[in-house]
Amino acid sequence: MIQNIVTSIILYSGTGVDLLIILMLFFAKRKSRKDIINIYLGQFLGSVSLIFLSLLFAFVLNYIPSKEILGLLGLIPIFLGLKVLLLGDSDGEAIAKDGLRKDNKNLIFLVAMITFASCGADNIGVFVPYFTTLNLANLIVTLLTFLVMIYLLVFSAQKLAQVPSVGETLEKYSRWFIAVVYLGLGMYILIENNSFDMLWAVLG
């Protein structure tokens, strides 16, 4: 259980670094109590929706009879990790700045939409393979851990928005942290499902 919690924390942290920077932008510009509450609600709405969508995909994929074939899903986070290393991470920060410039009144929807636009594909590509490796008990622990991490992510962004230099440092090094988490998760999924033999057979 402890290993499951630690893995979930690392995984969510890897997918949440981009969002941390984006949320810091919102908190730097929107400082009223109502706006702060709406940022929290928007982030929960966007993130929980992505997690729910990932669960649906994982549920369908669990009907694949071969564990080794299912394990090949680990290639998705490996691909995403290599993409981050070579091309950089998402353009969510630019989308957030554009949304703030337009002074969008529906802040909840704006934050949720940016969560989807900036992290949707990556999060689903990482969460789905991981969810397929979990039994029901570990899945429940993971989901509860994710909910706590969503809150901690927004809370951290709210506090760090008061220290501009932190945002610059995160932006500079985030791609390396994200890439390591994605690549590590992909390797873990391949190993956990004994998929390397099948992979070598296909490549050979």
Predicted regions and their residues:
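Small-residue-enriched transmembrane helix starts and helix-helix packing motifs
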Residues: 1-17, 94-118, 140-144, 148, ...
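Interfacial loop-to-transmembrane junctions
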Residues: 158-180
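Core segments of transmembrane alpha-helices
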Residues: 51, 116-126, 178, 182
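Juxtamembrane boundary at the C-terminal end of a transmembrane helix
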Residues: 188-204
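Juxtamembrane transmembrane-helix termini in multi-pass membrane transport proteins
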Residues: 2-62, 128-144
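Transmembrane alpha-helical segments of integral membrane proteins
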Residues: 23, 149-164
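Final/C-terminal transmembrane alpha-helix of multipass membrane proteins
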Residues: 175-193
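Membrane helix-loop-helix hairpins that form the core translocation module of multi-pass transporters
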Residues: 33-98, 156, 170, 187
